[in-house]
């Protein structure tokens, strides 16, 4: 099997991001981003997606977290697009429901080649540990725009904002794992009647 790995660097006047991934990993993760709550959520993607992730970012955190969070999403999306290759033989679609106490979230993904995000998370607080939760919209928008996926995220219930967000990221990791899995019956075939994605 071809190794599905990628390393991407993205440098702007606002951030310098390095991202390495292995889609067929074991969930190992290392982060040096400077935004602890984001790192905690990225760890959920690695662990539940069985994706090895190594991300470093030096950003303009003296202003706020916005550019760092968005650019990490963009760079992760670029790494996914590179590592997934031509998409032959993958399941393409993935979905997951994940609970955490009172919270329940659903994530559905399609490696369609068409970027689109529908995200409905009615946060009960504006921040968690000083982190502006609205920035997760920017993270996922950056990811879908560059991974070229369609992504639906719904928090179905929950009143603890940390739990709401954590269920989203765990479900995202599990949906990714399902979608990128190699389907032996589709080996070498494109999972689309168009013949391309």
Curated annotation (Swiss-Prot):
EC number: 4.2.1.19
Pathway given in the UniProt record: Amino-acid biosynthesis; L-histidine biosynthesis; L-histidine from 5-phospho-alpha-D-ribose 1-diphosphate: step 6/9
GO cellular component: cytoplasm
Subcellular location: Cytoplasm
Keyword Protease: no
Main enzyme class: lyase
MF terms in GO: imidazoleglycerol-phosphate dehydratase activity
GO biological process: L-histidine biosynthetic process
Record keywords, A-Z: Amino-acid biosynthesis, Cytoplasm, Histidine biosynthesis, Lyase
NCBIfam families in the record: PRK00951.1-1 (NF002106), PRK00951.2-1 (NF002111), PRK00951.2-4 (NF002114)
PANTHER family cross-referenced by the UniProt entry: IMIDAZOLEGLYCEROL-PHOSPHATE DEHYDRATASE, IMIDAZOLEGLYCEROL-PHOSPHATE DEHYDRATASE HIS7
HAMAP family: HisB
Family recorded in the similarity comment: Belongs to the imidazoleglycerol-phosphate dehydratase family.
Protein name: Imidazoleglycerol-phosphate dehydratase
């Amino acid at each position: 099997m071809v190794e599905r790995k990628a390393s991407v660097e993205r440098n702007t006047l606002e951030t310098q991001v390095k991202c390495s991934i292995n889609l067929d990993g074991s969930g190992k993760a290392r982060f040096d981003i400077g935004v602890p709550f984001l790192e905690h959520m990225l760890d959920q993607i690695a662990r539940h997606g069985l994706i090895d992730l190594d991300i470093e970012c030096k950003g303009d955190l003296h202003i706020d977290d916005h550019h760092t969070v968005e650019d990490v999403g963009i760079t992760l999306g670029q790494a996914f697009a590179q590592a997934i290759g031509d998409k032959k033989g993958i399941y393409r679609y993935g979905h997951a429901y994940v609970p955490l106490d009172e919270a329940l979230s659903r994530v559905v993904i399609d490696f369609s080649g068409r970027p689109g995000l529908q995200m409905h998370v009615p946060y009960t607080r504006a921040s968690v540990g000083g982190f502006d939760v609205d920035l997760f919209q920017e993270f996922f928008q950056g990811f879908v725009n560059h991974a070229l996926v369609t992504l639906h995220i719904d928090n179905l219930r929950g009143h603890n904002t940390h739990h709401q967000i954590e269920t989203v990221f765990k479900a995202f990791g599990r949906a990714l794992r399902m979608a990128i899995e190699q389907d032996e019956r589709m080996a070498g075939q494109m999972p689309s009647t168009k013949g391309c994605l």
